[in-house]
Amino acid sequence: MTKGILGKKVGMTQIFTESGEFIPVTVIEATPNVVLQVKTVETDGYEAVQVGFDDKREVLSNKPAKGHVAKANTAPKRFIREFKNIEGLEVGAELSVEQFEAGDVVDVTGTSKGKGFQGVIKRHGQSRGPMAHGSRYHRRPGSMGPVAPNRVFKNKRLAGRMGGNRVTVQNLEIVQVIPEKNVILIKGNVPGAKKSLITIKSAVKAAK
């Protein structure tokens, strides 16, 4: 069965194992998620569990949103997402960090940091041109393609806005779970800025 929870990225730190091994970790604060709706094939066409995370003031919610969360006897939520392959939950149930254990392998999804308008060297990792005095270009994108089509093909790697994309990093290891603080420590880095929404769920491609 799939495990899943929504959380907020706090930042990065480091811990040491009993043997003295140094491990960089990302701190994820995941307060209990509330099950707002259980979707079924009969009513919705597919099976999923809808959960809400991070309370918000009622004045910021409209009437339909208030009625939706009222079925679960909870406050309006800032973030609402769905998880598939989660069974045995009812509306109003809570998902906490206690479902995870140290050593679990998970996939982490977040929104990458926005970098603004960037050139091809930073955005796509292309090499720069010669920096000599006679060089015709230094940081430009280079050839636009052959003459014959009289146009630039789609998906040509050019300058543009970088970052702000939905990114999933697979097969990250949970190093430690601290239930009393609703905190999960994940080995390595995860996408997103501090205080951004993070989705944690069981790894799809984990070694069995």
From Swiss-Prot:
GO terms for cellular component: cytosolic large ribosomal subunit. InterPro entries: Ribosomal_uL3, Ribosomal_uL3_bac/org-type, Ribosomal_uL3_CS, Transl_B-barrel_sf. SUPFAM superfamilies: Translation proteins. Pfam families: Ribosomal_L3. The keyword ATP-binding does not apply. PROSITE patterns: RIBOSOMAL_L3. GO terms for biological process: translation. It comes from the Bacteria. GO terms for molecular function: rRNA binding; structural constituent of ribosome. Keywords: Ribonucleoprotein, Ribosomal protein, RNA-binding, rRNA-binding. Residues 116-148 are annotated as: Disordered. One of the primary rRNA binding proteins, it binds directly near the 3'-end of the 23S rRNA, where it nucleates assembly of the 50S subunit. Part of the 50S ribosomal subunit. Forms a cluster with proteins L14 and L19. Belongs to the universal ribosomal protein uL3 family. This is Large ribosomal subunit protein uL3. The lineage of its organism: Bacteria, Bacillati, Bacillota, Bacilli, Lactobacillales.
